[in-house]
Amino acid sequence: MTKKDAFFTLIGLFERTNIRYALVGNTDEYPDHIDSDVDIVTDEPGLAIFHREIWSLERSGLRVVQRFQHEITAFYYVLAFQMPDGGWGYLQPDICTDYYRKAIKLLDAVPMLDRRRRVDRPDSSGGGFWALHPADEFLYYLLKKIGKKSLSSAQFRHLCDVFLLDPDACREALSRFPTLSDRVISFVQENDETGLSAALANLKQSVLTSRSIPKPCRFRDSIRKIGRVFRPTGFVVVALGKSSGQEWSPLLHAALSGAFRRQADFHAAKAGLFRKLLAAKIASTFVLLEDNPSGLSRLLVDLMPSGQDVSEVASAVLDALSIRAKRRHCPVRKGVV
């Protein structure tokens, strides 16, 4: 399976189950080039169906190996698939309903889905997909970049290109955030990437400080954070001896890079190892330990492979992740699927 095949298998799930959805972000080169997460907006009924039906993709060669909640209504998945060369490929759908940042609601999903547009790919056997209207894409993408306080040249170019598709509609959408409107329009019209990048921190403060967090949202976000602690999505592998760790490190990290948010190498003698391992696992980090740890740190080890073959170790890690994800989230255990 290629990443293109994996993408259209995922899109087929939405189409087959009649989930209303729209992709967010620069999809100009989809499905041939997908170099980041696949960001998706849906409504609450659609999200419930997605959580239930995504497990059926295993019959098509896509395995759920990760799932975690990173906002009140946002869930990050990792789907693993075997590529034609025998290696592992990954597709990372990041799906949400209303757009929240730090438990503050910024955008409603339903109006955006009402205005979505069809993007056809006539040269692709998979067909097309749904994407946001240019005005919604402009505002959503801008708010994401402001929230992360990060904007690359390619991302700024995407904002400008989307703005040019419907300038009036983009201005109207941006008017919902008066503290952003004039400044952002000026940066875009003047092609001032440096100015917008420098203003991101200030713009973020103006967006978030002008809105309060309702108590129910604060409670839901606290529950989410507690869940991340008690259901960590990181993984710790012990290499059998220092030489194995040095040999495995680049190859194993390359094989598993798409399955985790971060990667790290630790030595078993590292000061404060237990605390560091726990923090790494909560942050969805793949950790390779050069030696077997002692004390409480041993409790955080997920795999101590007996073999030396990197591909076998990578497959064992993905098998363990798949089992863990099913145990935590798959509704088949409750007779739903």
Task: Briefly describe each language-model feature range.
Residues 45, 96, 239-244, 266-270, ...:
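Structural motif
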Residues 261-302:
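Conserved nucleotide-sensing/catalytic segment adjacent to the nucleotide-binding pocket
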Residues 14, 256-257:
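A generic structural signal for well-ordered alpha-helical segments
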Residues 237-256:
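Glycine-rich phosphate-binding P-loop
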Residues 19, 260-261:
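Short phosphate-binding/catalytic loops that engage adenosine nucleotides
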Residues 41, 100-102, 243-247, 292-295, ...:
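Short acidic, S/G/P-rich loop/turn micro-motifs used as interaction or catalytic elements
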Residues 1-36, 42-237, 241-242:
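Conserved NTP-donor binding/palm subdomain of two-metal-ion nucleotidyltransferases/polymerases, i.e.
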